[in-house]
Structure formats: structure tokens, C-alpha cells
């Protein structure tokens, strides 16, 4: 138990958040339970939430349940969905501990048993092929077999992932160092997808992956994309384990046309194709193709 608590003290739980004040306290405590207790540090960077949500933050801060808190008023220019990556980056970079646990309040954790998962996950971060330990996907991604009960994914999400803070700093320096150092001027090509696109590019370049536990009724982490009262309803159903089997392990499915959000009907192929087309026609889609091409060119350069 002492070793487990010592590892917990080395973790900073970090999140950028907007809204969802009604369920914030409950789900934050759900995350503590999932981890095995309050971690060494909790960092929350707000994106311009309403006063009711900010009041919840301040109460949690006064109670010692949030350790670092950054607020901006709702009228602040960074209250902008396309620039939320600024808050996400800040949440990670101001963390003080050697390990970062990314979480989102609309992402629901649950476990029965698996009490030693955190120290095992921290040990796995020293593997040469592991970028992070995580999950909470909404669709399939390229994946590979790992040790029994686990798989390796080509994706990593800030809905739920554990990584070394030093890895996060290295990723952002490699992928967007000049942009960050110059003060986030204008709009970045990836917009709000900056961090997760950076993770993907880094994993592809360095041949590392996210290690993910295969979900079963005793271990699930679901990204709901739910808000406010509906998020509270979804949480109650989730903790009661209602209809969870249909939402487990979306990354492992062969159906590339489906997005799964617990508590909502699946987003099927027609919408998926529209989303693909919309993404492909954005600067992010174009830039991601350029990045992938540069990675291929870099690997095949005979002078390297």
C-alpha cells in the first residue's frame, strides 16, 4: 500500500475544462476513486466557463481537491473552441510531478479491483514501445496485440491517458515549439486538435504506441460527450453498469464507420463520411497529410 501511495504522489492529474459545473465535483471524485486516491497534484485550467462552474472550481480549490487553478472570464478572447489547445497545453506544462494523467469531466472512469494498475502503468511507461497508457476512444484506430488483456494503439487522447511529463514536453517542443515560444500567434493549423495530432505524429515518428487495457465490466473508461443534467443522468446509468457492453473497446472494432459515445446512439457511416470530408477540406486535414508525408520522407531519406 505504501508503494502504491508513493506512486500516486508522483502523478499530476491535469485537465482543461469548459462548463459542466453540475457534475464536476462528482466526476472528479470518481477519478480519484479510479486512481486509488487523490493524486499528488490536480491541475485545472478553465476555458471561460460560466460563474456557476467557476464557483465549483473555487470551492474545490479551497478544499484542497484542486491544487493549481487558472481561470479566465467568459469574455476572454481565449474562450474559443478553436483555441482551447492553449488551455490544454498550459494544464500539462504547469504540472509539477513526473507523470501526467489527462482526464476530462465528460469521460467516466470505473474499475472493480485492478488495484495495482497505476504502479504497473507507470512501470510500462519505461518500455521502449510505450508512449502512454490510456484509452477512452470513440472509434477504431490502428492497433496491435500486446500482452494478455492489453493492446497497443496508434492514437492517444486527452480524455484519458497517463504519460511522463518529460514526454509531453518533448512532444510539444518537437511538434509546435516555435509556435508556442512565440505566444500562440493567430490560429494554428490543427486548431483544437493540436495536442492529439502532436501525439499521433510523435508516435508515428518514434515508433511508439499507447498501451490500452481491454475493457470488461470491471474496467471501463467511456468518453460520453454529454453535458450538464444529461451528463449526471449518464453517470448514474454508467455506475449502475447499464448497457456498457455495447460501448466497450470501440478501438478494436472492425467497423470504421461508427463513433460510440456512451448514452447516445452510434454515429453511423453517412455522418462519418461527412466528417471525413469536412476534416479533409480543413487546414487541419491538409496539414496532417503534409505532416505524414514529411514523416515518410524523413524515414526514407538515404542521408539520414
What would you call each of these model-derived segments?
Residues 1-30:
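N-proximal low-complexity "stem/linker" segments adjacent to membrane-targeting elements
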Residues 8, 95-98, 127:
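Active-site acidic short loop of glycosyltransferases
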Residues 26-40:
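Short, acidic, metal-binding catalytic loop of nucleotide-sugar glycosyltransferases
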Residues 28-32, 53-65, 149, 198-203:
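Short, aromatic/basic amphipathic alpha-helical patches
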Residues 44-96:
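Active-site-proximal specificity loops/subdomain of glycosyltransferases
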Residues 97-108:
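Short beta-strand-to-loop acidic/aromatic patch adjacent to the donor-nucleotide binding site
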Residues 108-188, 192, 197-201:
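Conserved catalytic core of nucleotide-sugar-dependent glycosyltransferases
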Residues 174-304:
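C-terminal catalytic/acceptor-binding lobe
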Amino acid at each position: 500500500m505504501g508503494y502504491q501511495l508513493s506512486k500516486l504522489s508522483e502523478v499530476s492529474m491535469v485537465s482543461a475544462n469548459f462548463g459542466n459545473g453540475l457534475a464536476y465535483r462528482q466526476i472528479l471524485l470518481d477519478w480519484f476513486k479510479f486512481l486509488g486516491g487523490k493524486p499528488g497534484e490536480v491541475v485545472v485550467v478553465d476555458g471561460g466557463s460560466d460563474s456557476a462552474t467557476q464557483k465549483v472550481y473555487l470551492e474545490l480549490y479551497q478544499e484542497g481537491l484542486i491544487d493549481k487553478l487558472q481561470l479566465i472570464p467568459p469574455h476572454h478572447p481565449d474562450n474559443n473552441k478553436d483555441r482551447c489547445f492553449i488551455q490544454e497545453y498550459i494544464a500539462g506544462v504547469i504540472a509539477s510531478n513526473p507523470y501526467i494523467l489527462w482526464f476530462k469531466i465528460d469521460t467516466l472512469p470505473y474499475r472493480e479491483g485492478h488495484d495495482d494498475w497505476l504502479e504497473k502503468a507507470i512501470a510500462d511507461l519505461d518500455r521502449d514501445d510505450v508512449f502512454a497508457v490510456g484509452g477512452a476512444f470513440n472509434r477504431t484506430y490502428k492497433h496491435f496485440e500486446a500482452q494478455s488483456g492489453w493492446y497497443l494503439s496508434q492514437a492517444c487522447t486527452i480524455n484519458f491517458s497517463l504519460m511522463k511529463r518529460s514526454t509531453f514536453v518533448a512532444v510539444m517542443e518537437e511538434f509546435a515549439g516555435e509556435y508556442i515560444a512565440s505566444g500562440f500567434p493567430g490560429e494554428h493549423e490543427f486548431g483544437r486538435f493540436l495536442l492529439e495530432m502532436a501525439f499521433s505524429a510523435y508516435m508515428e515518428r518514434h515508433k511508439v504506441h499507447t498501451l490500452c487495457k481491454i475493457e470488461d465490466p470491471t474496467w471501463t473508461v467511456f468518453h460520453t460527450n454529454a453535458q450538464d443534467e444529461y451528463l449526471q443522468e449518464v453517470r448514474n446509468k454508467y455506475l449502475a453498469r447499464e448497457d456498457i457492453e455495447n460501448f466497450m473497446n470501440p478501438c478494436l472494432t472492425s467497423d470504421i464507420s461508427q463513433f460510440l459515445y456512451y448514452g447516445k446512439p452510434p454515429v453511423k457511416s453517412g455522418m462519418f463520411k461527412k466528417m471525413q470530408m469536412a476534416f479533409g477540406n480543413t487546414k487541419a486535414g491538409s496539414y496532417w497529410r503534409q505532416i505524414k508525408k514529411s514523416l515518410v520522407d524523413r524515414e526514407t531519406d538515404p542521408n539520414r
